[in-house]
Swiss-Prot record:
MF-aspect GO terms: symporter activity
Family membership noted in the UniProt record: Belongs to the bile acid:sodium symporter (BASS) (TC 2.A.28) family.
Organism: Mus musculus (Mouse)
Gene3D superfamilies: 1.20.1530.20
Main location: membrane
Domain of life: Eukaryota
UniProt-recorded name of the protein: Sodium/bile acid cotransporter 5
């Protein structure tokens, strides 16, 4: 009886020993997806298998797509443990790799263990990448664009109405709606949609951080072009940027834990403060010009529309140039979420403002401020918090949202102007000539 029981135990143990994994990656933490950026990469595979004869085991690397990966050589190092160093030449794309451990005894070879269908993604960090190398722009062109931006913000300062500021101070409902949507509703929607679409953790975190960004300069620019309340838009942008110093670290901590991402997340305080100063200083100059030199303020107000349109197209061009390398990594789900994020911000802002019976220009402004996000603050958080290549993968989100929101707003502007044209021509025909 005891002999039969001992044999039964051996039968239980033997299959377990046969299924023991002898291979493991030594220099890679995330084995679900290997991400490479350089033209040549090395991976180290450790084998815990004890050779029956000296140097009888070897590693075979099988590549699914040789256009993405090519094996240069495999080097075996046997000291206390056995390591195989696989030298690979990489090309942009995705493929699968299978690693097999074989043992050779004379003419007979035996498969000992294998790591099947390990997913590999290769992408390049070219000069198009904002993070690795800036776009090469002539210094004179750079100074011209910078001067245009400062002049444009100064002109916006000339359009600030103190009566509107007093009204908002007494009834801050539009600002409160913007805060609730930007820092509570939008991050939750970003998290929920990223889970529904099954995005990787890094990309999901990128979208959540993009959704928790404050309003950007595009909000008050489009408030002007779409006949919203410019003063309210500027006030909402400054308020949300100030609150971002508190709300962005809170949301990054909360949602990173929900996504199962550990580590310290850094908030770019200097970048947020500099963004706020970059808005306030030239606009304060515009306010002073309006009160001290009204005639010059009128001239500045005349150029604000053409200047804003010019800067809008320059911004779209630069965003596409910088984001091109990231868009190569974007799939259908990422593009879909990139389109949904600004659209949801516009929808939530306009709908809630309408529910509270706010005037039409105010409804437009709340929608624009919650739909046009300063995505590049999310990019700064990602780059400070993650190591490459995870940071590169997460950076797809803010760039996709930035480009999709620019295209959506441009389309909205064209539709709005096309609808306005017939009504303007009708009003002109009805106007008496005398």
């Amino acid at each position: 009886m005891s002999g039969n029981f001992f044999i039964f135990l051996l039968l239980l143990v033997t299959p377990g020993e046969a299924k023991k994994s002898f291979l493991s990656f030594l220099n890679i933490q995330n084995t679900e997806m290997l991400s490479f950026t350089r033209t040549e990469e090395n991976i180290v595979v450790r084998s815990s298998y004890k050779d029956k004869q000296p140097h009888s085991s070897y590693l075979l690397v099988k590549l699914e797509d040789p256009k993405v990966l090519q094996v240069v050589n495999v080097t075996k190092t046997s000291l206390a443990v056995t390591d195989f160093t696989v030298n690979l030449k990489t090309f942009p794309g995705e493929t699968n790799v299978t690693l097999q451990l074989w043992e050779s005894e004379g003419r007979q070879t035996t498969l000992i263990d294998e790591l099947k269908n390990v997913r590999v993604r290769v992408f390049r960090q070219t000069d198009d990448s904002l993070l690795q190398a800036p776009i090469h722009v002539d210094s004179s062109i750079f100074l011209l664009v910078l001067s245009m931006i400062l002049l444009n913000k100064c002109a916006f300062g000339c359009k600030i109405e103190f009566q509107v500021l007093q009204t908002v101070w007494k009834r801050p409902l539009p600002i409160l709606l913007g805060v609730v949507i930007q820092f509570f509703l939008m991050p939750f929607c970003g998290f929920l949609l990223s889970q529904i679409l099954g995005l990787p953790k890094a990309q999901a975190f990128g979208f959540v951080m993009t959704c928790t960004c404050p309003g950007g300069g595009g909000g008050y620019l489009f408030a002007l072009l779409l006949e919203g309340d410019v003063t309210l838009a500027i006030l909402m942008t400054c308020t949300s940027t100030s609150l971002a110093l508190i709300m962005m670290p809170v949301n990054s901590y909360f949602y990173s834990r929900l996504l199962g991402l550990a580590g310290a997340f850094h908030v770019p305080v200097l970048k947020i403060v500099s963004t706020l100063l970059f808005i306030l200083m030239p606009m304060s100059t515009g306010v002073i010009i309006k009160h001290k030199m009204p005639a010059k303020a009128i001239c500045l107000e005349r150029v604000v529309r053409p200047l804003s349109l010019t800067l809008m197209f320059v911004g779209i061009y630069l965003a596409f140039r910088m984001g091109l390398v990231f868009l190569r990594m974007a799939n259908l789900e990422v593009f879909l979420l990139g389109l949904l994020v600004p659209a949801l911000g516009l929808l939530f802002g306009y709908s809630l403002a309408k529910v509270y019976l706010l005037p039409l220009p105010v409804c437009k402004t709340v929608a624009l401020e919650t739909g046009m996000l300063n995505s590049f603050l999310a990019l700064a958080i990602i780059q400070l918090s993650f190591s490459q290549p995870k940071a590169h993968e997460a950076s797809v989100a803010p760039f996709t949202v930035a480009m999709c929101s620019s295209c959506e707003m441009l389309l909205l502007l064209l539709v709005y102007k096309a609808k306005r044209r017939p009504s303007l021509s009708t009003e002109y025909e009805k106007t008496p000539l005398v």
